[in-house]
Amino acid sequence: MIEADRIISTSAKGDEEYIDRAIRPKLLNDYVGQPHVCEQMAIFIQAAKLRQDALDHLLIFGPPGLGKTTLANIVAHEMGVNIRTTSGPVLEKAGDLAAMLTNLEPHDVLFIDEIHRLSPAIEEVLYPAMEDYQLDIMIGEGPAARSIKLDLPPFTLIGATTRAGSLTSPLRDRFGIVQRLEFYAVEDLTSIVARSANCLNLSISDTACYEIARRSRGTPRIANRLLRRVRDFADVRHAGIISEESAKAALLMLDVDDAGFDYLDRKLLNAVIERFDGGPVGLDNLAAAIGEERETIEDVLEPYLIQQGFLQRTPRGRMATSRTYRYFGLEKLTE
């Protein structure tokens, strides 16, 4: 099984990016959660508008599915400017970036998703553009080549990344504002589910919103995906009404348990306990035991399990915690 196949995957699936636009908030006041980020951004935006300046360049980082793209669009909307969107892997040549920069209007937003995947050549073009609003372009080839400078209108670059540590220092230092998005509390996710249901004209109870929220692994993208699948279940079997009972039945059918775990999560934790006596177990042995690639364990399965206190990473290997034993209804063996 690969990450994209999981109902609780944090990656956007198929046309989800397009579907989610209908339920995305457009104003900071409608943005649920991340209170410190929202408070700071409201001040920064208001100050920039009072000075009639472009907003400082903004770096947004955090785990996938937490609303980095949504926040970028809100910033542009609040500033009353256009937003042009691209991603690091798409910008293969310096000319691709130059074309986008020269088409910006004053104070516009250029949003680059996965900015950590920019090539060094693209970064070199970005440095003077971000710092001096200038674009250095090479004209001609060989000995006849020469560099010319083009003035750019003041603009805001918003970069989004799940790996802030992978950004080069020169690029990271050019962002005047840096915001980290954290996993959401269940209460905030419950509000997000209720808001999304309202946007989709769904009949849903408060308790059903809560049942979906607490299985969403702190991630709005997962919450909205589960809501759509629960809606399908309710449309077919419960006349379109999403109650606590129908939500629980749908989530059981989807194999998402109360902790937000699916089959793969349980398989990994169970292997650590049953096959390796709770650990420590090396990553390669664990990967062989559950039939998955070690990269899948490191990048997909482990982060949430560690963050929730179900798995511990030690110098000697992975270990199950007391919480894991309680989850399976087992008693931890002591030597």
UniProtKB/Swiss-Prot annotation:
Keywords of this entry: ATP-binding, Cytoplasm, DNA damage, DNA recombination, DNA repair, DNA-binding, Hydrolase, Nucleotide-binding
Recorded family membership: Belongs to the RuvB family.
Region annotated Large ATPase domain (RuvB-L), chain positions: 4-184
InterPro entries: AAA+_ATPase, AAA_lid_4, DNA_helicase_Holl-junc_RuvB, P-loop_NTPase, RuvB-like_N, RuvB_C, WH-like_DNA-bd_sf, WH_DNA-bd_sf
Functional description taken from the UniProt entry: The RuvA-RuvB-RuvC complex processes Holliday junction (HJ) DNA during genetic recombination and DNA repair, while the RuvA-RuvB complex plays an important role in the rescue of blocked DNA replication forks via replication fork reversal (RFR). RuvA specifically binds to HJ cruciform DNA, conferring on it an open structure. The RuvB hexamer acts as an ATP-dependent pump, pulling dsDNA into and through the RuvAB complex. RuvB forms 2 homohexamers on either side of HJ DNA bound by 1 or 2 RuvA tetramers; 4 subunits per hexamer contact DNA at a time.
Protein's GO biological process: DNA recombination; DNA repair
Region annotated Small ATPAse domain (RuvB-S), chain positions: 185-255
One cellular-component annotation, GO: cytoplasm
The species this protein was found in: Pasteurella multocida (strain Pm70)
Protein name as catalogued: Holliday junction branch migration complex subunit RuvB
EC assignment: 3.6.4.-
Pfam families registered for this protein in UniProt: AAA_lid_4 (PF17864), RuvB_C (PF05491), RuvB_N (PF05496)
Enzyme class: hydrolase
Quaternary assembly: Homohexamer. Forms an RuvA(8)-RuvB(12)-Holliday junction (HJ) complex. HJ DNA is sandwiched between 2 RuvA tetramers; dsDNA enters through RuvA and exits via RuvB. An RuvB hexamer assembles on each DNA strand where it exits the tetramer. Each RuvB hexamer is contacted by two RuvA subunits (via domain III) on 2 adjacent RuvB subunits; this complex drives branch migration. In the full resolvosome a probable DNA-RuvA(4)-RuvB(12)-RuvC(2) complex forms which resolves the HJ.
Annotated ATP binding sites: 23-24, 65, 68-70, 131-133, 174, 184, 221
Catalytic activity annotation: ATP + H2O = ADP + phosphate + H(+)
Binding-site positions, DNA: 294, 313, 318
NCBIfam families: PRK00080.1 (NF000868), ruvB (TIGR00635)
Subcellular compartments: Cytoplasm
GO molecular function, one term: four-way junction helicase activity
Free-text comment on this protein's domains from its UniProt entry: Has 3 domains, the large (RuvB-L) and small ATPase (RuvB-S) domains and the C-terminal head (RuvB-H) domain. The head domain binds DNA, while the ATPase domains jointly bind ATP, ADP or are empty depending on the state of the subunit in the translocation cycle. During a single DNA translocation step the structure of each domain remains the same, but their relative positions change.
